[in-house]
Amino acid sequence: MIIAVDGSAASGKGTLAKRLALHFDLAHLDTGSLYRALGLHLLRSGVTAENAEENKAAAAVASLDLGLADSSEIRTDAVAGMASVIAAMPAVRSAFTTLQRDFATDPPHGGGAVLDGRDIGSVILPDADFKFFIDADLEVRVDRRTRELQAKGQSVIFRDVIEDMRDRDRRDRERTTAP
């Protein structure tokens, strides 16, 4: 069984995906964490959102330490911003597409998988057995993200979270690959 959970930033798709995976004893992949891990890797290498080059970012996928996807460091605004920028790059999306499809069709412990991310149901797994699209009002998503960051001890300015969320939504809507 393959389940795809798609949706906007901070809409709750990760929470739903984790609960489905636990309930049905399926492997889970938060595909956004892959982009965040690559974003963290690039930031550590001195690359910024302003100077990120598509081919270099895509090439970095092959040598990416996937353990970074489990790091708490990927949940910062800087990493989220970088992830949003590189996620708009067709070569980066292509590099991750194979990895995500392989995970879905051959999950770590067999039995099926739940994948969540922004284009999982439409692009990565269009033939998934079950597909969900999760969305919420901007205010609800900003509140969720603010509480998440505060719970991690980060100083948060509500206005900055709103601006960041609007910017991410705009980049997601306007990207030519998997908007």
Language model region names:
Residues 14:
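Walker A/P-loop
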Residues 21-31, 47-48:
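Post-Walker A helix-loop "phosphate-sensing" segment adjacent to the P-loop in P-loop NTPases
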Residues 34-113, 122, 139-143, 147-151, ...:
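ATP-dependent small-molecule kinase phosphotransfer cores
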Residues 129-133:
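Short, well-ordered beta-strand core segments
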Residues 10:
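Walker A (P-loop) phosphate-binding loop of P-loop NTPases
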